[in-house]
UniProtKB/Swiss-Prot annotation:
Protein name in UniProt: Large ribosomal subunit protein bL36
Species name: Roseiflexus castenholzii (strain DSM 13941 / HLO8)
Gene Ontology cellular-component annotations: cytoplasm; ribonucleoprotein complex; ribosome
Cross-referenced InterPro entries: Ribosomal_bL36, Ribosomal_bL36_sp
PANTHER family: 50S RIBOSOMAL PROTEIN L36, CHLOROPLASTIC, LARGE RIBOSOMAL SUBUNIT PROTEIN BL36C
Chain's gene name: rpmJ
MF GO annotations: structural constituent of ribosome
Length: 38
């Protein structure tokens, strides 16, 4: 999981969601694309 100031979807399978006030990117195709805003 990457922690970044700005999270963006990196492919068509990436979804931006908000959990407990934190923006996250989850990806069903490439788990490598997981990101968290921090």
């Amino acid at each position: 999981m990457k922690v970044q100031a700005s999270v963006k979807p990196r492919c068509e399978y990436c979804r931006v969601i908000k959990r407990k006030g934190v923006l996250r990117v989850i990806c069903s195709r490439q788990p490598k694309h997981k990101q968290r805003q921090g």
